């Protein structure tokens, strides 16, 4: 069986980054859950929903980068497989959010390359720190993402079932990823790390909503 060199891994990482950042480059592996009939939204409602979905798309870009960075540096093969499988499932979220943004005549965040780079670096560092911390980083990330999704679900216009079905399914997946990481040996992160993660998350949500 061929062993991948460091250059091979870097090329693979670059390919993954392009697939995460280039609009339309990511295809979902599962059907889009937004099977509800299209509903008419007021201009202000559509603008707000687009902002929320843009934030959620950026969050999934961050998750992709996190998993890619961790898979590059994780020490145990089973942990690398967990990271790679989670990244595949997160691709569905990317595609679903992008589809909904297109339906709303909107766009993904122009800041996504920045969020990807930051998250990739954090994921790689977590992997270097050790698999238990890497998995703990995943669990904390998914916990924070779930909180954002639950808040966004509450903010959706009552009639917007298409966006709601997407976010509900995404939230179920995020909670599953959190539980999987904890069951695989993830540990609680130090409080300063969790606070820093929350601060970065708030910056991402506030800027990606508009840009």
Q: Where do the protein language model's features map onto the residues?
A:
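Non-heme di-metal
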Residues: 1-211
């Amino acid at each position: 069986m061929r062993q991948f060199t460091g250059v091979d891994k870097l090329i693979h990482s670059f390919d993954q980054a392009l697939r995460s950042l280039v609009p339309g480059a990511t295809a979902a592996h599962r059907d889009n859950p937004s099977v509800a009939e299209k509903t008419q939204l007021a201009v202000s409602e559509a603008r707000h929903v687009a902002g929320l979905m843009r934030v959620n798309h950026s969050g999934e870009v961050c998750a992709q980068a996190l998993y890619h960075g961790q898979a590059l540096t994780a020490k145990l093969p089973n942990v690398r497989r967990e990271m790679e499988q989670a990244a595949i499932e997160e691709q569905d979220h990317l595609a679903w959010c992008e589809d909904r943004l297109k339906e709303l005549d909107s766009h993904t965040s122009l800041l996504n390359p920045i969020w990807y780079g930051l998250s990739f670096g954090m994921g790689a560092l977590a992997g270097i720190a050790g698999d238990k911390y890497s998995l703990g980083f995943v669990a904390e990330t998914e916990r924070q993402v779930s909180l954002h999704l639950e808040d966004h679900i509450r903010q959706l216009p009552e009639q917007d079932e298409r966006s709601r079905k997407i976010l509900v399914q995404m939230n179920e997946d995020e909670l599953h990823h959190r539980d999987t990481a904890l069951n695989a040996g993830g540990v609680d992160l130090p409080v300063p790390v969790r606070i820093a993660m929350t601060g970065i998350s708030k910056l991402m949500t506030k800027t990606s909503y508009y840009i």
